[in-house]
Amino acid sequence: MSDKYYRSAYMNVDLNAVASNFKVFSTLHPNKTVMAVVKANAYGLGSVKVARHLMENGATFFAVATLDEAIELRMHGITAKILVLGVLPAKDIDKAIQHRVALTVPSKQWLKEAIKNISGEQEKKLWLHIKLDTGMGRLGIKDTNTYQEVIEIIQQYEQLVFEGVFTHFACADEPGDMTTEQYQRFKDMVNEAIKPEYIHCQNSAGSLLMDCQFCNAIRPGISLYGYYPSEYVQQKVKVHLKPSVQLIANVVQTKTLQAGESVSYGATYTATDPTTIALLPIGYADGYLRIMQGSFVNVNGHQCEVIGRVCMDQTIVKVPDQVKAGDSVILIDNHRESPQSVEVVAEKQHTINYEVLCNLSRRLPRIYHDGDQRFVTNELLK
């Protein structure tokens, strides 16, 4: 990736905040392996830089959604353990073995097909984590008998290693009994067979709210980056997480709309008086969505309204007269109390903080801050 960029919109990523959040989980669960979830490009932050920094701060295990994500980490020197949480097509099993990546076993049928596709040339081990469906209703084995049968199949092959078993909570970020019921179901199933090296069920919410002594690993995702999975979780815990992302754009032009003049597609905003506007080089192609019309951004400490429709590449803001080209504008802030916090943006978009971060597109350069050091990655100029 290039360390150069040629546009006036970018993300700031605070690596020290990410490391601090990782240490929060290490402290909460001192006897458990923290499987840092860096899928979806580390929730938009940039998986390679984040994984490297976490390794420097003690991370030994990562989780991703796809083999492609795992291979990307391997290609950039990430040597720690990696688990693919999603389903790999059985025909591609040799690639996982080649790159020393652990895989999820979602069903007995998948395991049988995967074994058929292991070439005779492969002598390396294949680490497997069996997924149990305890109530999420997605991937995984639902009954104890099938779980035991899958373990027996794995044990028939010297090359295969039954390394882990896990489940995923559906409602850990909400009040109610379902999470407790899932956890009990998980324990009951796992206790009916031999236990692997890793037993894990806690996502970010589960890791913040539950002890789960039966398990010896946790899988925090969104909260590694400084964000609570829900308002309910934030209110229930005393743990302080540090938000790690800012979205910045610099004004590229200012101009004055006269009374009666409109701006942007559909002419949805018409000035009633002479109005100074600032044009920002960012739009919905960057993940700053059309629905953000009517929201507010921070321009030199002033809360300024987004007017007119957000375009693919440009956003228009009503600003004080003294604003000029080059001024910095905060669209997403890394302070939880800010009117531009990820949570405020998520509420405006009628979604969750996860989606806001994941929507921030690859064409935005990422500027990483590690104390006094600064690094840039630009995926468009690889």
UniProtKB/Swiss-Prot annotation:
* Active site: residue positions: K39, Y265
* Cofactors named for this entry: pyridoxal 5'-phosphate
Question: Matching InterPro entries, A to Z?
Answer: Ala_racemase (IPR000821), Ala_racemase/Decarboxylase_C (IPR009006), Ala_racemase_C (IPR011079), Ala_racemase_N (IPR001608), Ala_racemase_pyridoxalP-BS (IPR020622), PLP-binding_barrel (IPR029066)
What CDD domains does the record point to?
PLPDE_III_AR
Could you cite one Gene Ontology molecular function of this protein? Answer: pyridoxal phosphate binding
Q: Which NCBIfam families match?
A: alr
Assembly notes: Homodimer.
Describe the family membership recorded for this protein in Swiss-Prot or TrEMBL. Answer: Belongs to the alanine racemase family.
Could you tell me what this protein is called? Alanine racemase 1
Its source organism is: Staphylococcus aureus (strain Mu50 / ATCC 700699)
> What is the taxonomic lineage of the source species?
Bacteria, Bacillati, Bacillota, Bacilli, Bacillales
